Amino acid sequence: MRSFATQQNGIFKSVCSLDCPDQCGLLIHKKDGKIVKVQGDPDHPVTAGNICNKVRNMTERIYDEKRLTTPLKRTGAKGQAIFEPISWKEAIDTITSRWKQLIDEEGAESILPYSFYGNMGKLTAEGMDRRFFYRMGSSQLERTICSKAGSEGYKYTMGISAGIDPEETVHTKLFIFWGINAVSTNMHQITIAQKARKKGAKIVVIDVHKNQTGRLADWFIPIKPGTDSALALGIMHILFKENLHDEAFLSEYTVGYEELREHVKQYDPEKVSTITGVSTEDIYRLAKMYGETSPSFIRIGNGPQHHDNGGMIVRTIACLPAITGQWLHTGGGAIKHNSGILEYNTNALQRPDLLKGRTPRSFNMNQLGRVLLETDPPIRSLFIYGTNPAVVAPEANKVRQGLLREDLFTVVHDLFLTETAAYADIVLPATSAFENTDFYTSYWHHYIQLQQPVIERYGESKSNTEVFRLLAEAMGFTDQELKDSDEVLIRQALDHPDNPHLAEIDYDSLTKHSFMKAKREKPLFPGELPTPSGKIELYSEKMKQDGFPALPTYTPLVTDNEHPFMYVPGPNHNFLNSTFSNNEKHIKLEKTPKLFINTKDAEKHGIVDGAPVRIWNSRGECELTAAVGEQVLPGVVVSQGLWADEQGKKQLVNALTPDRLSDMGGGATFFSGRVQIEKV
């Protein structure tokens, strides 16, 4: 492994660590040992030197004076963020002595790790940490907050988390961005779409909010939250009725198309219009456009899956390319995630065999508040890393109430004293990605990339792998698996004979090339999919066995209160979840947290554009700035971004979101809450 950290000057290849599908190649400019500029790598075949504003300003985050430099011990009340510096030895001794006591008195399951992909590096997010907590026998975490519902739904149809190669979409003639603000969250897919548009391609956006991507589209279609499956079924109704389907493809590569043809007769445009808020004329127009344009491509976003019915929504949308046979056309098909193409050896990396036959209890991360407040026997210690649940998790007020428990020993490993860290007993300083050894796999394009250390550690910060090696040693765990170096971890993860796409990729080749493309000798079709039938399952017997309708179906959202407004807290352009929300430059770019309200609703409630507005339900309340217009349908309100706590302001939007779980995969239902609004 080469390390550029000791080299004082130069330009070095790197990779973006953010939880973003684009996983950009970077060039890091150093002078006198410090990063002075972050630039896109023009040699990367997909991202091609073009990077977002977040990464362009990454230097300010790396050298932010608010970064933690030493371990901290709480000296004030929980939540007040009053700490004193301590040594790493004291921190590790304090943590492990408490854990040993808890294990002796209450068992290892009284301890719970809580983490996610704030850094998408595989060692950082799911390497030595998994080994450590498996070895301990702690309670386990179901990490389902982001894409699990959609992944499960997509797999019922397609059998694998894979779609087409996005590089092929330069040939696409119709792009449908469905529930994704790609300008802000998948910018290079937009770049490709714009290239195709110069050759005549059309861009359609279906979303609850006319955001940056909606404004770029040739045609924006607003839709009521959680009704996407009804729209997809209405499109199928017309495709079959108007003979716009591909009978040969359906016969050869799918199962259940005859049953589906009969099933969708009930989803006529008039019925679907009532459900979705999309006019019958637009439903016809969209279906005709989709049925008559080839190749067509659907980019399925994360938005639709964050509903009570999110898995079924994605399962249903995933059926559409099969109806018109798009998978046989270069540039045709869909992408939800492409993580299946770059699937590495998770068993070798995470080593679940260290459980040694134990089956500890597990908890869904979306329900952290109720886990901390209601579990019996209780969780007595929480180790949090790679996430900021006091801002990011649903029912955030309940989460913070749980973190206030005096009998809860909480450790946070982070770059900053986050809102979550304010409740910790011990805080550990974390390295940035540019200080780590790691590897990254995109969940959109087909390239895997290696991260080599570019700069020296900031202060006394340590990487996740280093922290868990120290904890393992202090706990008396002598297993070699808990001593493996970062290089060994990467070698183990990339040794995956079951995935032929990685056949020519290993640690040595990645070290030489920095990034490499997965090997894909044949297209998705013709071929055999890993569904029970080996085909696209429009009718799924597996779904029936699992308690779901065998055919794609629309089911309404849960009504948890009688408030009149559906509330969708979407992402914004200059933050990534809570990352960058503490950076003054990014805050100034976003200006203020807004609530988008339809003109008719604003008039009814006496709310004017730019005025403060109270948004509330039984879970909590916020005060945001009204953005009045036609960006959302009547009965829908939308905010953008997860804003950092600020004295005297009520902008914690996840105080309003439910912690119910989605229909499939135990996913989050951020976008299925209801609220009331009123002028302040």
Swiss-Prot record:
SUPFAM superfamilies: ADC-like (SSF50692), Formate dehydrogenase/DMSO reductase, domains 1-3 (SSF53706)
Sequence ranges assigned to domain 4Fe-4S Mo/W bis-MGD-type in this UniProt record: 9-66
Keyword list, A-Z: Iron, Iron-sulfur, Metal-binding, Molybdenum, Oxidoreductase
Protein name per the record: Probable oxidoreductase YoaE
Organism in which the protein naturally occurs: Bacillus subtilis (strain 168)
PROSITE patterns recorded: 4FE4S_MOW_BIS_MGD, MOLYBDOPTERIN_PROK_2
Family membership: Belongs to the prokaryotic molybdopterin-containing oxidoreductase family.
The organism's taxonomic lineage, starting at the top: Bacteria, Bacillati, Bacillota, Bacilli, Bacillales
Cofactor: Mo-bis(molybdopterin guanine dinucleotide)
